[in-house]
Amino acid sequence: MQQHYDYIIVGAGSAGCVLADRLSESGDHSVLLLEAGGSDKSIFIQMPTALSYPMNSEKYAWQFETDAEADLDGRRLHCPRGKVLGGSSSINGMVYVRGHACDFDEWEEQGAKGWNYQACLPYFRRAENWIDGEDEYRGGDGPLSTCAGNKMTLNPLYRAFIDAGKEAGYPETSDYNGYQQEGFGPMHMTVKNGVRASTSNAYLSRAKKRSNFKLIKGVVVQRILLEEKRAVGVEFELAGELRTCFAKNEVISSAGSIGSVQLLQLSGIGPKTVLEKAGVTPVYHLPGVGQNLQDHLEVYFQYHCQKPITLNGKLDWFSKGLIGTEWILTRKGLGATNHFESCAFIRSRAGLKWPNIQYHFLPAAMRYDGQAAFDGHGFQVHVGPNKPESRGRVEIVSANPLDKPKIQFNYLSTERDRQDWRDCIRLTREILAQPAMDEFRGEEIQPGINVATDAEIDQWVKENVESAYHPSCSCKMGADDDPMAVLDEECRVRGITNLRVVDSSVFPTIPNGNLNAPTIMVAERAADLILHKQPLPPQRSKVWLAPSWETQQRTGEPMR
C-alpha cells in the first residue's frame, strides 16, 4: 500500500466526497480518502422512497444515541450518522435546503470571517445542477442534481397545504432556496433521474476514475499522527491490522459533527479534562472541541384524512412491490421521491428577521420507523423550531475509537426554546384548520385537541419530540479572540498546523434548514482555501425579508 499522499481525508460523507473530487481534480495532488463504512450500491440507499431503511441500519449508519436528556424527562434520542460511501447524504431524507441568507451573515458575525451569504452563494451555485436550470440563485451545471420530485402532481394534499398557509396569512414562495425563503411552496430534493443524488454519486464517482486518488473502505481511524503540533498522517485499522499513512500537505477530518470531535479528542486535541478522563494524553488543550453542539428537534403533527388518497394506502407489501418494480424499470413514480414535496418556513413571532420554523409536508401518517401510524388514511407535517438556544457537547469516554462517545444536546434547556415549541404547535394547528384543508382534514391524531395549554404542550413535546438528525457546530469556526473557536475562518485547527476540519461541525450556528446543502457548500469553499485558489467573487444578490418583520409575525391576516 502506498504510504505517502499530499492530502488525507477522513470520512467519505457529505463533505469528504466533495473534497476528494475537488482536491484530486487537477491531477496534481495525490489524495487518500478513508471511510469506515462500505459500498452504497444498495436499492435501499439509491431508491428515494426507501429512505427509512438505511438510517435505521447498523450496516449503513453509526447508531448513536444521546445521554439521558434532562428536559425531555430523561429520554435518550436516536442520533444516526452515515457509515457508508456518501455518509449521511446516503441515509438522509434527501431534502435540499440551503438555509436562510441571514444564517450565513450570522456565521460571519460570530467570527467566521468571509462566510457571509454573498461569499457562500457562489459555492451553493457551483455545487448545484438544478433541474429548472441556472439563474441568479441556482446552479445549472454542478455535480449535485436537485429537483422538486414529482412536482406535487401525484397528490392534491401538497397544494392544499400551500393554500392553507396562504389562507393563514403567510406568503407563497416559488423558490425557498432563491430570493425568498419565507413562506409556503414546493420542496426540493437531491434526486437525479429518480435516484438519490448523494455526494458519493455526485462527486466521489468522478474522483474514483483518477489515478491520483485512492479510496480505502472499512477503515477505523485511530488517531491523527502529530509531530510537534503538526499533523503528519493518520493511524488506522484495516482488516485487524494497524497501519499508517502520511500526508505531505494536510490531514482533513470530514468525519461529521460526532466523528470529527471523536478523532480530534482521540488524537489529544480538545478539553484537557475530557482527554485525561478518557485516558488520552493531551497534546493541545483546545476547550471548544465537542462544545457548542446544536441540533433540530421535530414532531409529527398528524391528522386523519377523509379521502383515501394518502400513502397509507401504499404501505402493504403488494403495493410496495409495485412501486419498487416501477422504480427498477423506469426510475419513476412513487419510488422516485422522498414524498416531501411541499414545505414552509415561517417566523414564530414578530421581531424575528428571518424564519425559525420549518415544515415538511407528507401525504401519509407514519411512525419514526417508517411504519403506518394507524389503520386508515392520514397526513402529517414534520415541524419544529430551527434556531434553538440550547447547546450541548460531545466527549469521548475512552481511547478506543469504537466506544460510542457521550452525546448531550441539552434539548429544550432554555425558556425561549420551550416557548418556541408552544408557538410552533399553536401556529401549526391554526394553519391546518384553514379552509383549503377542509375536504381532507379529519380528526387531529396528535398532539390531539386536548393538548392546548402551555403545560399540556410542554409535556406532549417532552414525550414525543425526536431529533431531525441535524447534529452540528461542535468544532466551530470563530475569531482569534474566541476561546471556544476550534477553527479559524479557513477551517484550520487552532494550534495545530496542516490539520483542518471540513463538515457540519464547523458551523458556528445551526442554519434554518436541513444540513446537507450547507455542508456541501462548506466543502466546496474549503477546497478552494485548501488549494490556495482565489475564492469565487462574492455575489450581491437581493434577499427578501418581510417588510414588517419587526412588528408583525406574518404578512397577512388569517381567514380563520
Curated annotation (Swiss-Prot):
Database matches in PROSITE patterns: GMC_OXRED_1 (PS00623)
Active site per database record: H470 (proton acceptor)
Enzyme class of the recorded protein, top EC level: oxidoreductase
Residues where FAD binds: 6-35
Keyword NAD: yes
GO BP terms: glycine betaine biosynthetic process from choline
Keyword list, A-Z: FAD, Flavoprotein, NAD, Oxidoreductase
GO molecular function, one term: flavin adenine dinucleotide binding
Any one cellular-component term (Gene Ontology): membrane
Cofactor(s) needed: FAD
E.C. number: 1.1.99.1, 1.2.1.8
Pathway as given in its UniProt record: Amine and polyamine biosynthesis; betaine biosynthesis via choline pathway; betaine aldehyde from choline (cytochrome c reductase route): step 1/1
InterPro entries from the UniProt entry: BetA (IPR011533), FAD/NAD-bd_sf (IPR036188), GMC_OxRdtase (IPR012132), GMC_OxRdtase_N (IPR000172), GMC_OxRtase_C (IPR007867)
Catalysed transformations (reactions): choline + A = betaine aldehyde + AH2; betaine aldehyde + NAD(+) + H2O = glycine betaine + NADH + 2 H(+)
Xref: Pfam families: GMC_oxred_C, GMC_oxred_N
The keyword Flavoprotein appears for this protein: yes
Domain of life: Bacteria
Family: Belongs to the GMC oxidoreductase family.
Job description of the protein: Involved in the biosynthesis of the osmoprotectant glycine betaine. Catalyzes the oxidation of choline to betaine aldehyde and betaine aldehyde to glycine betaine at the same rate.
UniProt name for this protein: Oxygen-dependent choline dehydrogenase
Species name: Vibrio vulnificus (strain YJ016)
Name of the encoding gene: betA
